[in-house]
Amino acid sequence: MDQKLSKLVEELTTSGEPRLNPEKMKELKKICKSSEEQLSRAYRLLIAQLTQEHAEIRLSAFQIVEELFVRSHQFRMLVVSNFQEFLELTLGTDPAQPLPPPREAAQRLRQATTRAVEGWNEKFGEAYKKLALGYHFLRHNKKVDFQDTNARSLAERKREEEKQKHLDKIYQERASQAEREMQEMSGEIESCLTEVESCFRLLVPFDFDPNPETESLGMASGMSDALRSSCAGQVGPCRSGTPDPRDGEQPCCSRDLPASAGHPRAGGGAQPSQTATGDPSDEDEDSDLEEFVRSHGLGSHKYTLDVELCSEGLKVQENEDNLALIHAARDTLKLIRNKFLPAVCSWIQRFTRVGTHGGCLKRAIDLKAELELVLRKYKELDIEPEGGERRRTEALGDAEEDEDDEDFVEVPEKEGYEPHIPDHLRPEYGLEAAPEKDTVVRCLRTRTRMDEEVSDPTSAAAQLRQLRDHLPPPSSASPSRALPEPQEAQKLAAERARAPVVPYGVDLHYWGQELPTAGKIVKSDSQHRFWKPSEVEEEVVNADISEMLRSRHITFAGKFEPVQHWCRAPRPDGRLCERQDRLKCPFHGKIVPRDDEGRPLDPEDRAREQRRQLQKQERPEWQDPELMRDVEAATGQDLGSSRYSGKGRGKKRRYPSLTNLKAQADTARARIGRKVFAKAAVRRVVAAMNRMDQKKHEKFSNQFNYALN
């Protein structure tokens, strides 16, 4: 009974499941009901499992405790008698002993313990004084918030509050820094916006100011807005007689028309009092308005006109007149896109994260809207040409060349003049055939250069010519140097083809020469930097060096012999292996002589083959270790693949269902750590450091100032 109880507790607590197995839990309850001794033993086993450094084991053990606590008075007495230790193991009330990993299971354990203790106090708090005191201790001393869904302790809440305060402080500092940056850069941004707006107004003389009612880029003209306002019969102050300075830059179709309330064809509405008075200035304005409307063919204010501008017509064509403006606009827009707009977006993000600096946030949002509006204008105007600066430069250069060419006067060519006479017509003109131009020029250059070198007495050509003058004239060819017969020539060619060819080396350089200084080394007895002995230094002859200058090492790998045999081991499909390896087949091992059916000819090889077949028959094909490992990884069950592993079993986990705490998370830091701190990498680093120390020791070991380090 005791062994069965221990086995049930171990299986339930090490299952790793979020819920307990109902059948095993039913058996455990049945054993605990049998006697108080078994109940006490179950309590001790559960407390032992609660001390394990694994949160999943503690969670399962607490679930068993919760099931038994509400059903047995004796079990409640055992738990309440050691209630403080129970809370430390399940709730983590001791900051020095936090709950073990994994973190998710520890969080579930803390939440379950908080709910259970609160429920136990409501049901059994009056009957068990220690339980009520423990609940009071948790609420008032440990400051456990039972309404908190995360069931955090006081220490955890303090840590999180400190962490949040630290983050708030960092965000506040960043927001203050952003505010200072905005104060410093606002003037620069405003001047940049003013500059690019001025460039746009000079490039395209339309009013591109954003309309407060719409977000268009000024596609609709101001004329339609004025007509709509006059049609609605709105009464407002007219424009003064002084013209707007911007009216001169606008076309006549987009000029704002002053509202005329006294026009007889205008819509209904109250007439202003100024109209009743016979002011001559008002009459002049009315007459000017009527004349302006009639001259443009409008005739009335009771209808509106929508002027649509083609988007293709807004693209700026680059020429010499607007080249400087386009360059300035391009530079400014590049500055906005690469510097100002990212900075403004960063300011908005910092101000939004802090929640304060409302005025700064509003100002940053306005700046962002203005910058984005400018970029949209740039995109619609398409002021950047496709050809780039190189094409513009070439065009300007061609224009300058054309201007320079205009200074010359064109003279007509003479009739019948031939600047070049073809080769086939040269005899008709009484001229000789022209030699190859390139050959003549090349020969002249070579001859001129040789003459110059010979005339220089310090040159090698002059010295060579001097030696040739002193040498006797060459004698006639000897009979031995006569041309050989065809048979001798063939024999000589065959011998030359059979003769080995070796690269040029030191041995050929000193071939047949006596080397008086070969292998001699000057040996000095004193190694001091300043004091030298007065006697003559000795010379030591090294025979190895002399031999190196007269000999050569030639590696003879032998003659290549192709493989003539096959593996001929039987394959699963019934055919024989046709690999031609020299000694060993990578699939069937050492190559041995076999007959036509694949059986080894040597009796020892045949016996070894039979033993291997018997071992293979003992293990079915479905028990392939690789296949079983794949199935185990997919199902989580142990199928015994380690028993068939040929390289050793390895260390088996005791509870494979639990989360492996030793397994590292597959993060970039962990992967880099595995590569950097691998045993082979550490050995390489240690070996390299040892070599560096050895070189330093060999170089400075005899100097006293380095010997102390």
Curated annotation (Swiss-Prot):
Main location: nucleus
Covalent link Glycyl lysine isopeptide (Lys-Gly) (interchain with G-Cter in ubiquitin), residues: K414
GO CC annotation: chromosome; nucleoplasm; nucleus; site of DNA damage
Coiled-coil regions listed: 165-199
Subcellular location: Chromosome
Top-level taxon: Eukaryota
Binding site residues for Zn(2+): C567, C577, C585, H588
Biased composition (Low complexity): 477-486
Start-end of Acidic residues biased regions: 280-289, 397-406
Xref: InterPro entries: ENTH_VHS (IPR008942), UVSSA (IPR018610), UVSSA_C (IPR049431), UVSSA_N_a-solenoid_rpt (IPR049408)
Pfam families: DUF2043, UVSSA_N
Record keywords, A-Z: Chromosome, Coiled coil, Disease variant, DNA damage, DNA repair, Isopeptide bond, Metal-binding, Phosphoprotein, Ubl conjugation, Zinc, Zinc-finger
Skewed-composition ranges (Basic and acidic residues): 1-10, 386-395, 592-632
Consequence of substituting W120A: Impairs transcription-coupled nucleotide excision repair ability
GO molecular function: chromatin-protein adaptor activity; RNA polymerase II complex binding; RNA polymerase inhibitor activity
Chain positions covered by the region annotation VHS-like: 2-145
Keyword DNA repair annotated: yes
Basic residues bias: start-end ranges: 646-655
Role noted for this protein: Factor involved in transcription-coupled nucleotide excision repair (TC-NER), a mechanism that rapidly removes RNA polymerase II-blocking lesions from the transcribed strand of active genes. Acts as a key adapter that promotes recruitment of factors involved in TC-NER. Facilitates the ubiquitination of the elongating form of RNA polymerase II (RNA pol IIo) at DNA damage sites, thereby promoting RNA pol IIo backtracking and access by the TC-NER machinery to lesion sites.
Disease tied to this entry: UV-sensitive syndrome 3: An autosomal recessive disorder characterized by cutaneous photosensitivity and slight dyspigmentation, without an increased risk of skin tumors.
Name the UniProt record assigns to this protein: UV-stimulated scaffold protein A
Lineage of origin: Eukaryota, Metazoa, Chordata, Craniata, Vertebrata
